Design a protein with these regions (language model features):
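Membrane-embedded transmembrane alpha-helical bundles that form the catalytic cores
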Residues: 1-527, 531-578
Length: 579
């Protein structure tokens, strides 16, 4: 029984564990009791917020231990600063203070190793990180239980730091008024369904809900259950199975697998990370909805995107909206460059690229994450420039690039893996561009649905492959010790590029399909379901929600039994826990 109330870093409260659902059942029982018996409507709301904040803090303690103190400090700090912003004659100074405090903590815990390594590389020194918080903790414990030579990243700090920054910024902009009760504000910051892995809930989206009475219709209950079951299926059947049975093996030892296997691992990793992250979000949305709270949508079938810009409008939407509202637009959006008049295309491209770099660093303190963010930024810029070109110019430039690559190959006989990959990619894009150009010439005189469908499918395929390739750097930098992340991540990425660029053997494709048939089938099934029309998906959600309660219970039991058949021996944590 004592284990329920003690922190165990090896057993955090995960949505896929029985312990979480036991915790939620107890919390929900208390929640229902409060909503039925706690006096007036205002008293019920106040009691509900305090109760759920206490439950959320317990949840975070079970997930991150003593780092609950960091969450408490951030809560108190931003609450007090938020009170001062509308009262002060210089509100911007208070906003700057809030942002500086929040980002200082984020930089300390997340980027200390990254910038220390840069400093050592530049100046040839051997500076080591020092955990000042562990040092202070040892002063109170008298037994030196905390390691001072290692900085541990608190779970979810990137998410709740961005939330409190949005709170101060929204007050400054006049979008919301400061929360007058510290406990209500603490509830907003720490609401447990989305605390450790999002979605990032901006203050203007959630604070008004603090004062709305609980309301849950029969249909909303069904929708909430649907999202929970949908998330569990995504996480356990798709994400975990693909990871354990194929993806992790390839990324751990890329040189033991052929170029095709490495390439297919990149494609399946795109499915894994989507199923994992959107699965968490689905469960969070469902759990929150059962308590009458609405969390923002975080994914909108991102692999239907026709270009990188559209992808980032559909993927991790809460982060994309945050970056747009608090980074891209303050930088000037598509209006200016360094405060001076500039072309719309140039300024928007610069700001987009810088925003993607920041987004890459938000995910992790490694050069691989910087490269990942930069690649996405470059992809967006190229696509913007491409779409701004005349159709004839597009084809001519693509033809010239292809001819140049072929001539360079003949003259240099290059054997660099990355060059090989670029050459293949250019040839494929040229072939697709040629087909598109012929179709465009024909379609300029007549409308053809088939040509339009092929054009759309080609754009979707190109975007999916491009995004999957950028994730080579994302995945290789994940789940690593921050002290050695740069070196290990770069080695993995380099090995995979070598294999994909040089060790390609078509003869192993069919044996591979036979050996990993369940992996291939799950990947294909996942993509087909993902590409289903949104209209159809909405219909089967509503159909599920409209079922009689006994049938919903039976469906839930069936899903749990099915998921149990796929569950792995070692529970896989959610990918975005590390961010």
């Amino acid at each position: 029984m004592i284990e329920w109330f003690t922190y165990d870093p090896a057993h955090p409260l995960l949505f896929t564990q029985f312990y979480f659902w036991a915790f939620f059942a107890i919390v929900y029982a208390g929640f229902a009791l409060i909503m039925q018996r706690a006096g007036s409507s205002r008293a019920r709301l106040h009691a509900r917020n305090i109760y759920l904040m206490a439950a959320s803090w317990f949840f975070y303690y079970k997930t991150s231990g003593i780092f609950l103190l960091i969450l408490a400090f951030i809560t108190i700090s931003d609450f007090l600063i938020g009170q001062q912003i509308p009262r002060s004659k210089r509100p911007k100074l208070w906003l700057i203070l809030s942002v500086c405090i929040d980002l200082s903590l984020l930089f300390y815990f997340k980027y200390a190793y990254f910038f220390t390594n840069i400093f050592n590389d530049v100046f040839g020194t051997n500076v080591q990180v020092f955990d000042i918080f562990a040092f202070i903790g040892n002063g109170f414990s008298h037994d030196g239980r905390f390691l001072v030579d290692r900085i541990i990243l608190p779970v979810g700090i990137s998410f709740y730091i961005f939330q409190v920054i949005s709170y101060a910024a929204d007050i400054y902009r006049g979008k919301i008024k400061p929360v007058t009760n510290l406990l209500d504000f603490g509830f907003y910051v720490s609401f447990f369904p989305q605390l450790v892995a999002g979605p990032i809930v901006r203050a203007s989206e959630f604070v008004p809900q603090l004062y709305k009475p609980f309301f849950l219709t029969r249909r909303q209950f069904g929708i909430a259950v649907f999202w929970i079951l949908n998330g569990l299926l995504k996480k356990i059947i798709l994400s975990d199975y693909l990871a354990v049975n194929f993806i992790d093996r390839v990324f751990q030892s890329p040189m033991l697998f052929s170029g095709f296997e490495n390439f297919f691992a990149l494609l399946t990793y795109s499915m894994q990370v989507y199923a994992d992250f959107s699965g968490y979000t689905d469960i969070a949305i469902g759990v929150a909805l059962l308590m009458g709270f609405y969390l923002p949508k975080n994914f909108d079938s991102p692999y239907k995107s026709r270009n990188p810009q559209e992808f980032w409008r559909r993927w991790h939407q809460s982060l994309s909206r945050w970056l747009k509202g608090y980074v891209y637009i303050p930088l000037g959006g598509n209006r200016t460059l360094f405060g001076r008049p500039a072309s719309k295309l140039l300024s928007s491209n610069f700001n987009s690229f810088l925003t993607m770099l920041i987004g890459g660093l938000w995910h992790g303190a490694s050069w691989n994450f910087v490269i990942w963010g930069a690649l996405n930024g470059v992809g967006m810029i190229i696509n913007k420039c491409w779409r701004a070109m005349n159709e004839h110019l597009r084809y001519v430039l693509m033809l010239l690039l292809t001819v140049s690559m072929v001539v360079a190959r003949q003259l240099t006989n290059s054997a660099y893996p990355l060059i090989n990959m670029i050459e293949v990619w250019v040839l494929i894009v040229w072939a697709g561009t040629s087909i598109w150009y012929i179709g465009w010439l024909w379609g300029a005189r007549t409308t053809n649905r088939f040509i339009a469908w092929v054009d759309n499918a080609w754009d979707v395929l190109q975007t999916f492959v491009f995004i999957s390739f950028t994730r080579l750097f994302f995945r290789s930098a994940s789940n690593l010790d921050p002290a050695t992340a740069n070196r290990e991540a770069w080695a993995t990425a380099k090995q995979m590029v070598n294999q994909i660029g040089c060790a390609w053997d078509n003869s192993i494709i069919w044996p591979f399909m036979q050996e990993y048939k369940y992996v291939v089938l799950l990947f294909v099934a996942g993509m087909i379901i993902h590409w289903l029309p949104d209209r159809f998906k909405r219909r089967y959600r509503l159909w599920f929600a409209a079922m009689p309660l006994p049938l919903i219970v039976l469906a839930a039991a069936a899903v749990v039994l099915l998921a149990y058949q796929f569950i792995t021996a070692d529970m896989q944590p959610f990918i975005y826990f590390q961010f």
